[in-house]
């Protein structure tokens, strides 16, 4: 009796399902997620493979039969440019004329010697037409010998050296060394305004110490002198420093001087470093979206081509890709931004001599002045 009841309990349902037990095993949430991911990956792989297979089929060219070449190979004849009259006049006295019965194999050597004499004649001649003609022959001639190339390089080096060679410079004395800040002086400065390179603009800094003249006797720029600079442009891709041009300095006593000097860091390196924001997600999120949209268009084009509607969908695909590229181009080309905090130390690299002779005057003070008055 009991066996009959157990057998009835485990009998197959009338619907024919073999898994009719109500205590069957269920999939957990993580297992469902894994299965869904696998299915999604397989679907994307099939779409990508289908698009790639179509691209390969479109790019494949029909195989052609190559007929065997039964004719012997003959090299192309060497074209020798005609000699100019000026070159011929310089070459004719030095080129030996071979006898008429000389074999044909000597023609190549005769051409080589002729090129050597042409190079020597051009090197010794200073006329511009000969040089221009030789340059044209160099462009058109195929048989350029190593000797001729060395002559060209030597000629160019001599011309460049003679053009850029500077005359001898004479030493001079500074007219007012006590009142001058010479070129190359590095002046420290503390930023009063923060820097953000999103837009061009002006910056301001204050000198934390006195700046003296060349003799280190007279203070020319007092502590607290304000300096105004200009940021002319922002950063480009790959830049990590911003260029600031310092325009003018004003002392607490209202003495002003034009600097026109570039910025530098504490060690004198050009430009100012800072915190650089490359806008990675803003730039590459658009790139990833563009790639996804193009992949979707390619997959849809493959499907439409296989179903017979490829002609109409290809035009839609091209228009969609152009619209997407136009919309996302500005997002992908976002330039980086450099930010520098207020209070950071920067440097001013003096680019020219600063003369304060017309601003300050020297006079004797203290004991020196009293001694002079006694002598007088």
From Swiss-Prot:
VirB proteins are suggested to act at the bacterial surface and there play an important role in directing T-DNA transfer to plant cells. GO terms for cellular component: plasma membrane. Gene3D superfamilies: Type IV secretion system, VirB10/TraB/TrbI. The keyword Transmembrane applies. This is Protein virB10. Keywords: Cell inner membrane, Cell membrane, Crown gall tumor, Membrane, Plasmid, Transmembrane, Transmembrane helix. Pfam families: TrbI (PF03743). It comes from the Bacteria. Belongs to the TrbI/VirB10 family. The keyword Amino-acid biosynthesis does not apply. Its main location: membrane. It is a single-pass membrane protein. The chain crosses the membrane at residues 33-50. It is found in: Cell inner membrane. NCBIfam families: PRK13855.1, T4SS_VirB10. The gene is virB10. InterPro entries: T4SS_VirB10/PtlG, T4SS_VirB10/TraB/TrbI, T4SS_VirB10/TrbI.
């Amino acid at each position: 009796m009991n066996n009959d009841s157990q057998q009835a309990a485990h009998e197959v349902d009338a619907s024919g399902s073999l898994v009719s037990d109500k205590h069957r095993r269920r999939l957990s949430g993580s297992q469902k997620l894994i299965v869904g991911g696998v299915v999604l990956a397989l679907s994307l792989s099939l779409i990508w493979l289908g698009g790639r297979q179509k691209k390969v089929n479109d790019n494949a060219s029909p195989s052609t039969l190559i007929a065997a070449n039964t004719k012997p190979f003959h090299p192309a004849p060497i074209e020798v440019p005609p000699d100019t009259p000026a070159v011929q006049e310089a070459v004719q006295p030095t080129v030996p004329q071979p006898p008429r019965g000389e074999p044909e194999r000597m023609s190549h050597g005769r051409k080589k010697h002729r090129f050597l004499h042409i190079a020597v004649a051009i090197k010794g001649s200073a006329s511009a037409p000969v040089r221009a003609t030789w340059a044209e022959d160099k462009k058109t001639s195929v048989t350029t010998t190593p000797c001729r190339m060395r002559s060209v390089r030597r000629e160019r080096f001599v011309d460049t050296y003679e053009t850029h060679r500077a005359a001898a410079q004479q030493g001079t004395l500074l007219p007012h060394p006590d009142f001058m800040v010479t070129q190359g002086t590095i002046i420290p400065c503390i930023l009063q305004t923060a820097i953000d390179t999103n837009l061009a603009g002006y910056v301001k800094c204050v000198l934390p110490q006195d700046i003296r003249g060349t003799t280190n006797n007279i203070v020319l720029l007092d502590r607290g002198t304000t300096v105004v600079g200009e940021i002319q442009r922002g950063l480009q891709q790959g830049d990590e420093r911003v260029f600031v041009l310092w325009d003018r300095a004003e002392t607490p006593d209202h003495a002003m001087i034009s600097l026109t000097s570039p910025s530098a860091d504490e060690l004198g390196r050009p430009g100012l470093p800072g915190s650089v924001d490359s806008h990675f997600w803003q730039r590459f999120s658009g790139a990833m979206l563009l790639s996804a949209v193009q992949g979707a268009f390619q997959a849809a084009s493959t499907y439409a081509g296989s179903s017979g509607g490829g002609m109409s969908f290809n035009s839609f695909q091209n228009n969609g890709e152009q619209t997407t590229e136009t919309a996302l181009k500005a997002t992908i080309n976002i330039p980086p931004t450099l930010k520098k905090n207020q209070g950071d130390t920067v440097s001013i690299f003096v680019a020219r001599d600063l003369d304060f002779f017309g601003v300050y005057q020297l006079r004797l003070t203290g004991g020196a002045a009293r001694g002079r008055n006694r002598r007088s």
